[in-house]
Design a protein with these regions (language model features):
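Conserved, hydrophobic alpha-helical core segments of structured domains
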Residues: 1-133
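Charged substrate- and nucleic-acid-binding regions of tRNA-handling and nucleotidyl-transfer enzymes
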Residues: 113-184
């Protein structure tokens, strides 16, 4: 599995990654190790992306197929995570700034972007539109810092503990997001 993964990553890094799949498809070489790739539309491979991680994340496969492929080839967790994140959140971010604050906050939380924005930034890098990507960099990334700095008023914070505190903080963050999104 490790050797097949190494060759797979080399193919993803190649100038023409589709050739790897074409050759294996022509000799029925995909069936054992890469069966999910047999029906994959090769014209949809992300040729304009040089990084194997980005190309893997953009493979035109279903979530189940990506999961099975990653497990079989013992792919590094970052590759599977990038693909799952893309499938889960790219569409939401593509609607920027006409997104629902609650949905956006849920995505930010699940990506743990208030603590480390790398996963969110990778999704943004996977966008086809440089204009939208730059807009998100200008608007969403600073908004994360603002969200992180939001706090409950002291009198309200003093009366809440545990899950109730977290729910109240989420509520003010979602409200803040909705207000900011409406102003964009």
């Amino acid at each position: 599995a490790e050797r097949v993964w190494q060759e797979f990553v080399k193919a993803l890094a190649a100038p023409q990654p589709h050739r790897f799949f074409e050759v294996l498809r022509s000799c029925h070489g995909l069936s054992d190790w890469l069966p999910e790739c047999q029906a994959m539309p090769l014209n949809q491979l992300a040729r304009h992306r040089p990084e194997p991680l980005e190309r893997f994340a953009l493979l035109p496969l279903s979530a189940d197929d990506v999961q099975a492929l990653a497990e079989r080839l013992l792919a590094p967790k970052a590759f599977l995570q990038a693909a799952v994140d893309r499938m889960s959140y790219l569409l939401l971010l593509s609607d920027w700034p006409q997104v629902d604050g609650a949905a956006l906050f849920q995505a930010v939380e699940q990506l743990k972007a208030l603590h480390d924005s790398r996963r969110l930034v990778l999704i943004m890098q996977l966008m086809d539109s440089p204009t939208l990507r730059h807009r998100l960099e200008r608007e969403l990334l600073p908004l994360l810092a603002e969200l992180k700095n939001l706090a409950l008023p002291a009198d309200r914070a003093a009366t809440l503990k545990g899950a109730a505190y977290g729910e109240a903080l989420t509520e003010i963050r979602v409200q803040y997001l909705n207000e900011r999104l409406a102003a964009l």
